[in-house]
Amino acid sequence: MKLKLILLGSLSPLIGLLIFFLQLQVPFHGIKYLVILAIMSAVFLAYFFFCAFFFSSKQHKKNSLYFFVTPFILFLVNFIGWIQKYVVLALIVSGVSAPFHYVLPDLIFPGDKYYLIMSIFPLVICWIAFKIGERVGIYFKERI
């Protein structure tokens, strides 16, 4: 179970990058553009929710730790300066943040002193979606 959670967590930056590249294909026009971006971000958060939902149990309290090993390591690697010089490599490393790039514009390449807060914000949002899925999964498994 731990290995499955680590592998599913390792897929999340790749899925985030895929959603980011899909967002680049959306024409930049009006409310339809914003709705499509919101739907794509919601689909990305649904991935975290359903992974937690299907792996939730009262015995395994550390599911989120195993699931977020790879995204957190990539978050730390993102602070290496030379990675930011190469846009594609920086996007791969910040894959969990990528779907939120158009929602929060200064997220991937900010230049201010609050870089850490803005960079960890998407990871926190994904963690909250994971925890909600875990709680809902435990609730439904108790009812059955």
Show which residues each predicted segment covers.
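Transmembrane alpha-helical segments in integral membrane proteins
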Residues: 46-52, 118-142
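Hydrophobic alpha-helical transmembrane segments
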Residues: 103-126
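Membrane-helix interface and helix-disruption motif detector
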Residues: 24-36, 59, 83-89, 107-114
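Canonical alpha-helical transmembrane segments
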Residues: 39-63, 67
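Short hydrophobic, aromatic-rich alpha-helical segments embedded in or entering the lipid bilayer
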Residues: 87-105
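Alpha-helical transmembrane segments and their helix-start/interface "positive-inside/aromatic belt" motifs
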Residues: 1-7, 60-70
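Transmembrane alpha-helical insertion/packing segments
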Residues: 1-44
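Hydrophobic alpha-helical membrane-insertion segments
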Residues: 65-88
